[in-house]
A protein has these predicted regions:
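ATP/NTP-dependent adenylation/nucleotidyl-transfer catalytic domains that generate, transfer
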Residues: 1-181
Length: 181
């Protein structure tokens, strides 16, 4: 009998298979909803992150929240506030919250920006990013970097990403799938 994460991931994989079949039947392209924060650290289930294109795959989670607020401010409440303010969760187990498994997204995104795209930020932006990173426990910081390194094999199997940032996964950043971390 499967237990824990292995059992939880069955639900996500079945959902992916169902959605791909439904998309196929309708003759439509399935869109992957993964984002750069989750993709970076492998916080997704293989074969649940399927699709023909990942529209928001190069946006950090904090950027997605900002984009949602911007859309609502400029076009009316298209995205219900309950969706934006809902605690992020993979919803594979009761009371599951992304930030309990990882860390609050502003801190995670700061670590990822430093690791992936540091040279593309202005000095002022780098100071803001560094200020957030300075608040992170060094062990948690190291854990996030380890997750980043270990997730390459998952990213290689994900839907193609529309590149927004200077360094997107895929063509913008390639490292061996298997390497010593």
């Amino acid at each position: 009998e499967l237990k824990g994460v292995a059992a939880e991931n069955i639900q996500a994989r079945v959902r992916g298979v169902f959605l791909m079949a439904y998309s196929n039947q309708l003759g439509n392209l399935m869109i992957c909803t993964g984002n750069k924060s989750e993709n970076s650290v492998g916080y997704f289930t293989l074969w649940d992150n399927c699709g023909g294109m990942s529209i928001i795959g190069d946006l950090y989670k904090t950027e997605i929240f900002d984009l949602c607020y911007w859309i609502n401010e400029n076009y009316g409440e298209i995205i219900p506030l309950e969706i934006i303010t809902k605690i992020p969760s993979a919803e594979l187990a009761p009371n599951m919250e992304d930030e309990k498994s990882l860390m609050p997204y502003p801190y995670l995104d700061a670590i990822l920006k430093q690791e992936l795209e540091w040279e593309y930020f202005s000095i002022e932006e780098q100071k803001e990013i560094q200020a957030l990173i300075d608040e992170v426990d060094p062990k948690e910081h190291a854990r996030m970097l380890k997750l980043l390194d270990r997730a390459e094999f998952k990213r290689q199997q994900s839907a193609p990403i529309i590149r927004i940032h200077p360094r997107a996964f895929g063509n913008g950043r390639k490292i061996p799938i298997v390497h010593k971390c």
